[in-house]
UniProtKB/Swiss-Prot annotation:
Keyword Metal-binding: no
Listed SUPFAM superfamilies: FAD/NAD(P)-binding domain
Protein name: Monooxygenase CTB7
Gene that produces this protein: CTB7
Pathway note: Mycotoxin biosynthesis
Function: Monooxygenase; part of the gene cluster that mediates the biosynthesis of cercosporin, a light-activated, non-host-selective toxin. The perylenequinone chromophore of cercosporin absorbs light energy to attain an electronically-activated triplet state and produces active oxygen species such as the hydroxyl radical, superoxide, hydrogen peroxide or singlet oxygen upon reaction with oxygen molecules. These reactive oxygen species cause damage to various cellular components including lipids, proteins and nucleic acids.
InterPro entries: FAD-bd, FAD/NAD-bd_sf, FAD_aromatic-hydroxylase
Organism, scientific name: Cercospora beticola (Sugarbeet leaf spot fungus)
Enzyme Commission number(s) of this protein: 1.-.-.-
Family: Belongs to the aromatic-ring hydroxylase family. KMO subfamily.
Pfam families: FAD_binding_3
Presence of the UniProt keyword Nucleus in the record: no
An example molecular function term from Gene Ontology annotations: monooxygenase activity
The organism's place on the tree of life at top rank: Eukaryota
UniProt entry keywords in alphabetical sequence: FAD, Flavoprotein, Monooxygenase, Oxidoreductase
Lineage, broadest ranks: Eukaryota, Fungi, Dikarya, Ascomycota, Pezizomycotina
Length: 419
């Protein structure tokens, strides 16, 4: 076993954790990745945009990722009968923005995770421990100790990285409780996502979005180029306390029952298909959309990366991009200053804080969810009319509703540990 001064624990085996592990290993650290799930079948479609694409090139993974994209060719709004109201908006390029939500690199989270995990696990100084959680953390002057659930014994590390998402255990174990409480910024947007069977008579490579009043929407998108499955999203914009309570503490059965009641009345081919698919899905997940905002991304020898430290929420489309960029910079700064982690973590924050803050801005001054999911039939008519205008005129190519327009200069690091 390596001495604790070159041994790092990364909690979370998703994209943020796997990319962090990859670059830390390249920097000469011995990395242990703990992932609480034995498997994680669920996950939404995610985008890789801007400078994150440069990082996947550095990892040698660009072609594999491109080969695994969903094949989505654009997005269209459909009427109450499920018919397109106008031609679809096409894909957006990696650099620059359009009004399309479909990015050039659109991939399911589970597929992207597997690619990143495979790359990290291929390195000799990375170990993944599945079905394992971090139960206790104790900080010391020159090390940090964690008790891991698979052994129940304390283990020493030079640092612990929380790459464990919105409900980060590392954030809860190492940051002040009041700071933790204030870090969570909830919205009134809720989403359930799951897989449903494809319908060759109706489906195309284009995502389809249908609206109903009271802030409801159903979005169905390709999962892969085969077309045998689709990803389905049931979206609600509401200040309903019932939704908030069920999202927070309800069982999966409670959540499905509430969504069944809210979405069953959808007309056309999407409503019945979505609700029936929800009940049979084995990858169902329901959540309230929140952002995480902190004034510092580290506490002692514990640091946060990705959603654990600065989730921008799916409303911005920047979560995966921030996770990849954050992982690269965090690992790079640690490799540059392995004996002065306070300096490394402070530099990590200084380099990315402005970029993260601007990337967390929800479009239209935070009003995007209300505009995208109207409360009234009149609002839906206005949205569909607007969609027709930007589709038929091609104006959508000149607009930007969520692509990466905020730029960041990434340092070049000498990852000399492994070639």
């Amino acid at each position: 076993m390596a001495s604790s001064n070159r041994r790092v624990l990364v909690n979370g085996g998703g994209p943020a954790g796997a990319v962090t592990a990859f670059w830390l290993a390249k920097g000469g650290f011995e990395v242990v990745v703990t992932e609480r799930s034995m498997s994680r079948p669920y996950g939404q479609g995610v985008d890789v945009t801007g400078r994150a694409s440069d990082i996947i090139k550095k990892m040698g993974l660009e072609q594999r990722i491109r080969d695994s994209t969903t094949g989505e060719a654009g997005l269209t709004v459909v009427d109450d009968q499920g018919e397109d109201v106008a031609p679809p908006l096409g894909t957006a390029p990696i650099e620059g923005g359009t009004a399309s939500v479909t990015q050039e690199i659109e991939i399911m989270r589970r597929d992207l995770t597997k690619i990143f995990v495979d790359a990290a696990e291929a390195l000799p100084n990375v170990t993944f421990r599945y079905g394992c959680t971090v139960d206790e953390v104790q900080q010391h002057e020159k090390s940090i100790t964690a008790v891991l659930s698979d052994t129940g014994k304390p283990e020493d590390f030079t640092a612990i990285i929380g790459a464990d998402g919105l409900g980060s255990a590392i954030r809860k174990l190492t940051f002040d409780p009041e700071i933790n409480r204030r870090s969570v910024s909830p919205t009134n947007t809720y989403v359930a996502f799951f897989s449903i069977p494809g319908d060759p008579k109706y489906d195309t490579p284009v995502g389809k979005l249908q609206h109903a009043n009271k802030g409801r929407g159903i979005l169905v998108r390709p999962i892969d180029k085969k077309g045998t499955q689709r990803s389905c999203y049931l979206m609600s914009q509401s200040d309903s306390q019932e939704l908030a309570q069920v999202a927070r503490t309800g069982s999966q059965e409670d959540q499905k029952a509430l969504l069944d009641n809210r979405f069953r009345e959808f007309t056309g081919p999407l409503g019945k298909r979505a609700v029936e698919g929800m009940h049979s899905a084995d990858d169902f997940y329901f959540t309230r959309i929140v952002q995480i905002k902190l004034d510092s991304w580290h506490s002692g020898r514990a640091a946060l990366v990705g959603d654990a430290g600065y989730s921008p929420s799916p409303l911005t489309g920047q979560g995966t991009t921030l996770a990849i960029i954050g992982a690269y910079v965090l690992a790079g700064e640690m490799a540059k200053s392995p004996d002065d982690l306070e300096r490394a973590f402070t530099s990590y924050y200084a380099i990315l804080n402005k970029f993260v803050s601007e990337s967390q801005e929800i479009p239209f001054g935070g009003q995007a969810p209300k505009l995208i999911l109207p409360q009234s039939d009149w609002g839906i008519w206005l949205l569909r009319t607007f969609y027709k205008i930007i589709s038929w005129t091609g104006i959508w190519r000149l607009l930007n509703f969520g692509n990466e327009t905020v730029k960041v200069e990434l340092p070049e690091y000498d990852f000399g540990g492994l070639d």
